[in-house]
């Protein structure tokens, strides 16, 4: 997606805001330079909210300003104009105008937006994450439904359809997810991100991953009280479906269960020879579905360093490399 022009009418510091972007055929990046308070973050927030508004009526209701957005995507020239409550969308030679509901249906049928959006904000006044969290609530619900449909297909001989997980469209790195990016990069295949991170931070490899799973969330998928004892057999059953290659690692890394949580210390993830994308997607499912929390310890020379104890600069680098590279 290449944005060509953005016009915003009277939103916070963006008053009669109109900016044209210099684009290069075949793809290009845009750098925003400006003084503090010039509206750089507000502009990025507006672009993100415009994209999310076509996935979430709740976010659309928050946009109380008129705007015009012109961009190129999938070899199409697209224009979206919002004036009050009226919309007009043009995609090459096709055009539609009317209410939000009408144009939203048109946009979804014609694939006018990217399938993956990555957002990153390193400042203190983070206005991006709350709305991304709202949109991703539906993603988490769809993942839970996928697990329940899987269980239904296993328990009903007439069900022959094995469901697939949806793809996460809006990606934003919460602080608690930084360790997952770290282990995905270091335990995955050879890549630019892996080489750069090792060289820049002098990391050697992942020594182990401490993981805590909320087993109450696991039992909610099955129905409470289905599994008894300390061993999280219900979790293993679900991870076999999510990605069976990780289940044995979890079994060997299991330590104990207490007060509705199961504790693991996982080693030798890189020995399984799984690529970074598969590692990320597996642990992201555990993070989103079962409130799993992680601590990754890496070797750095003769020392061991936890992800939570790394410098702010190292953690920001891990986020950027993970979100853009995997």
Predicted regions and their residues:
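Pre-Walker A-like glycine/lysine-rich segment at the N-terminus of P-loop NTPase domains
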Residues: 2-45, 326
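Conserved P-loop NTP-binding catalytic core
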Residues: 44-102
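Short, well-ordered loop/turn elements at secondary-structure boundaries
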Residues: 1-3, 26-27, 37-38, 63-65, ...
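Electropositive, glycine-dotted interaction segments
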Residues: 90-229
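Short, solvent-exposed loop/turn segments at secondary-structure junctions
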Residues: 11-14, 24-27, 37-38, 51, ...
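A structural detector for beta-sheet-dominated domains
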Residues: 9, 20-22, 70-72, 81-83, ...
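Extended helical coiled-coil dimerization/tether regions that scaffold
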Residues: 24, 180-326
